[in-house]
Amino acid sequence: MHVERQGPYRFCPLCSGTLESRLLKKGDPARLVCTACGYVVYFDPKVAVGTIISMPNNEIVLVRRAIEPGYGLWVFPGGYVDRGEVVTDAALREAREEAGLEIRLDGLISIYSYPRRPPVIIVYAATAVGGELDHDEESIEIATFSADQVPWKNLAFQSTHEALRDYYAGVLHPHCK
């Protein structure tokens, strides 16, 4: 039976028994199940958040990644939502950490997910309301771009392309904040 790559997991986190792939329910993917205690390992998606930040001159903020995946490529500020953290609070935190900016969330652009990839990416449109443009250790540099300057061929992820495309097309759900 084929199981999607589920990491290097071979032993049960509860009893250290051996994990094996089993089909528990028709139509569901195979799961790793402990042969000793029956514990089922579920691999949940990971939630990430991003913000397309508009500056007073109507340019947007992008950062050039200093980490893999996508080293040297451009993305908007974003990152993973911490367990128990409100998604909008994570968006504000990531803008502050990665761009040095305080922002106002203007609305949801969209939610992006892809087959066989764990991240679910929630992207907001935002406006800078304070702080000073500055990058952290996860970025090589930070810059602002007008719509015709966006480095489309040097964007890190499919979600970055799609969210920027949606942003410039005017996709915005202002009541979803």
Language-model segments: residues:
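A broadly conserved sequence feature marking short terminus-proximal activation segments
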Residues: 1-9, 166-177
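NUDIX/MutT-family hydrolases
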Residues: 135-164
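Active-site-adjacent beta-strand/loop module that shapes the phosphate/pyrophosphate-binding cleft
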Residues: 44, 112-133, 143, 163, ...
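Conserved hydrophobic "DFG−1" position in protein kinase catalytic cores
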Residues: 53-54, 62, 126, 144
